[in-house]
């Protein structure tokens, strides 16, 4: 059934989803703050999708606009496809225009992003009866070669989602099964937070790439992963699963979770990353000043620290990576601390109830 879909954010992922949904026959509108980007999409009339996507070709976009109200008005599904550092700011802009019955998808939700987003909507007076849906990752590994043309390196066969609170999971699953059949709805946003694998393979391994970056050595981020980087990622992954266990959740290790998303072989993080053909050609950064630290430390690893604090457990490797990152980039955002999320005095039991409804 055709849906009226709004995409907030016209970066790599936003353009990919806009073209993908349009090619499936949905009415798609897309928002971005960049007038240059919006003009280019309007001039083209849509987005071209190439590569390893289940659908390829030119997807016609109904509207591209820098005006939030024009894009989300009347939409059934609103996909927020932006780095998590911008989710709160977008929530502020969206709050006056959201409408009863809409599904707002944090796509993806960095750990505990739904708490921050809902707090923002409340702060800015949103009274619309909406439902928040969170995904753990994007459907695609993709890059926009230029505005209006996206190359998809790989498309996942399955990935997790939930509503916030998760008591609306069954209803949402019915709505989304025809739009994103790859989604499976799971326990709650604690699980979705911990399913965010970027926190495992971005900050720690990026710190270990400092020598490459500062020596201007070109490298492919995943294909050139080293065994040492893999060991740090494995240690971070064990602490991620430890947090899940503290909340009574059965969290799959990185390798099993990754294999559920991609058809890939391997027994270690090092193996599965290097064996994923969809990652070929994805070059690594040449600076520490990138989202792999700017976003994934304060908005993912710090959120893991918050979950660990609520659960009353220690996560020394995660703490160490956060500390080193803050020494490398002195002006990192404070991030999703218990204080910033309004969770300072919340018990583990109260937080679980908040997440499940």
Question: Model-predicted segments: where are they?
Answer:
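NAD(P)+-binding Rossmann beta1-loop-alpha1 motif at the extreme N-terminus of oxidoreductases
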Residues: 1-51
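Nucleotide donor/acceptor-binding cores
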Residues: 3-4, 130, 157
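Rossmann-like NAD(P)(H) cofactor-binding subdomain of soluble oxidoreductases
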Residues: 84-148
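Internal alpha-helical scaffold of NAD(P)-dependent oxidoreductase catalytic cores
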Residues: 146-219, 223-257
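Rossmann-like NAD(P)-binding element
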Residues: 54-93, 97, 105
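NAD(P)-dependent Rossmann-like dehydrogenase/reductase catalytic/cofactor-binding core
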Residues: 212, 230-357
